[in-house]
Amino acid sequence: MDKPYHVKFYSYNFPLPKPVVTAHGHWQRRRGLIVELTDQRGNRGRGEIAPLPWFGTEDLASATDFCRSLKGRITPAQIEKIGDRLPCCGFAFGSAEWELESGSVIENSPNSLSYCQLLPTGEAALDYLASNPQLGASTFKWKIGVGDFAVERDLYGQLWRRLPEGCQIRLDANGGLSVDIAQQWLTLLDRQRENSGPKIQYLEQPLPPGEIDEMFRLQEDFATSIALDEAVCSLAQLAQLYDKGWSGLYILKAAIMGNPRVLNHWLKTHPIPAIFSSVFETAIARGQVLALAQKWNLPDHAVGFAPLREPITEATPDSV
């Protein structure tokens, strides 16, 4: 019979360093839970529940109810059975157990990874570049699908001209484009591939997750790579798109994809061009996700995490 772990958990609540504006809306605060497991020998491991309900995960209230329902105890068998209904809880308890058993999920230093700088949305990106002439990254992401296409297209042209030659640009629509607008973006990006200057790396999630067939057609019709994000935010979705033959990139938000050991095992047997991405978690989940990225992130592609020079939030009990 499995010996239960003792469970402690607490909430956290902090403002994002810069509000994030996407096709999903405005996001200003990060709320979540930290769980701690202790076995009968005193070994401890921590994990983080960082919900992203607009990506289809459980919300914070459901995660809190689950943690309370445990009444301070959980067995390894229960951790295995958390399942897809509570993927963020699955990640937290799975990574805490992994850390407890191995001493640390991080087997290699993630310092060899390169990082991606998220630029402010809209015209604020130009102000950012003007006030930060010494850029600390060589890969940049800019959100689109938030405003009018013509305005964003013109802003992107200015942005492209101001970024240093040789850097990489990722455009992220968060599923906010129509097929027609996505085609116009891809036509523009394909044309830029022939020019010197910054290089477009990919267009991320141009269409809503339900429009998979249309995204397959876009991937076939244009040279610019398409990366799926909202469409592969669970392991079940990832496996389904892999079986269907998706030839583009996969953005993996591991902190919302369930038990990390299960994901790690799947990636061992399914080689895919994966790029690991942040959900604006604290240092706890960040380190655990970057440990997976160290193994499985596509070589020569930056992870979708802020550069190390930016402040990384440590998890402290919520006082709000």
From Swiss-Prot:
Q: Which reaction does it catalyse?
A: (1R,6R)-6-hydroxy-2-succinyl-cyclohexa-2,4-diene-1-carboxylate = 2-succinylbenzoate + H2O
Q: Which CDD domains match?
A: OSBS (cd03320)
GO biological process annotations for this chain's record?
A: menaquinone biosynthetic process; peptide metabolic process; phylloquinone biosynthetic process
- What does the function comment of this entry state? Converts 2-succinyl-6-hydroxy-2,4-cyclohexadiene-1-carboxylate (SHCHC) to 2-succinylbenzoate (OSB).
Active-site positions on this chain: K143, K253
Q: What is its EC number?
A: 4.2.1.113
Pfam families, per the entry: MenC_N (PF21508), MR_MLE_C (PF13378)
Pathway in which the depicted protein is active: Quinol/quinone metabolism; 1,4-dihydroxy-2-naphthoate biosynthesis; 1,4-dihydroxy-2-naphthoate from chorismate: step 4/7; Cofactor biosynthesis; phylloquinone biosynthesis
The cross-references to SUPFAM superfamilies, in alphabetical order and at most eight, read:
Enolase C-terminal domain-like (SSF51604), Enolase N-terminal domain-like (SSF54826)
Which InterPro entries does the entry mention?
A: DgoD-like (IPR034593), Enolase-like_C_sf (IPR036849), Enolase-like_N (IPR029017), Enolase_C-like (IPR029065), Mandelate_racemase_C (IPR013342), OSB_synthase_MenC1 (IPR010196), OSBS_N (IPR041338)
Binding locations of Mg(2+):
D172, E204, D229
Source organism of the structure: Synechocystis sp. (strain ATCC 27184 / PCC 6803 / Kazusa)
**Protein name (database record):** o-succinylbenzoate synthase
| Named cofactor requirement(s) | a divalent metal cation
Q: Which family does it belong to?
A: Belongs to the mandelate racemase/muconate lactonizing enzyme family. MenC type 1 subfamily.
Identify which top EC class this enzyme belongs to: lyase
Write out the entry's keywords from A to Z: Lyase, Magnesium, Metal-binding
Any one GO MF annotation of this record: magnesium ion binding
Check the record and name the Gene3D superfamilies matching this protein.
Enolase-like C-terminal domain, Enolase-like, N-terminal domain
